[in-house]
Amino acid sequence: MADGLELSAELSVHTGTVTHTIFVYVFLGKSKRLKTFSDSNVGSVIKLEAGFAVWSRCEAANGEWMEADNEDRCRLYQIYRESKLKEFARYNVLSRVNW
């Protein structure tokens, strides 16, 4: 990225039947525009302010991908969608998610 620093992180939480994967891309720099991403291997794109974007995907035990807004199986999506930019990095996923 020409105008700043690009950071990325990946977090996977494995339960008995579902694997939750969160992809986080953080952009620090002059640009405050919303960043839009496209990746056919990842589920829904959640656009947040100041250059944050979060991907959430869920994979069932049978290997079938589900929609990221399926609240029954993708609670991580809800937590990250509702989080604020400055609070995002402080989230402890394992303690915040009620499986």
Swiss-Prot record:
GO cellular component, one term: membrane
Main localization (coarse): membrane
Localization, UniProt: Membrane
Protein's name according to its UniProt entry: Putative uncharacterized protein C9E9.01
Transmembrane segments: 10-29
Membrane topology: Single-pass membrane protein
Keywords from the named record: Membrane, Transmembrane, Transmembrane helix
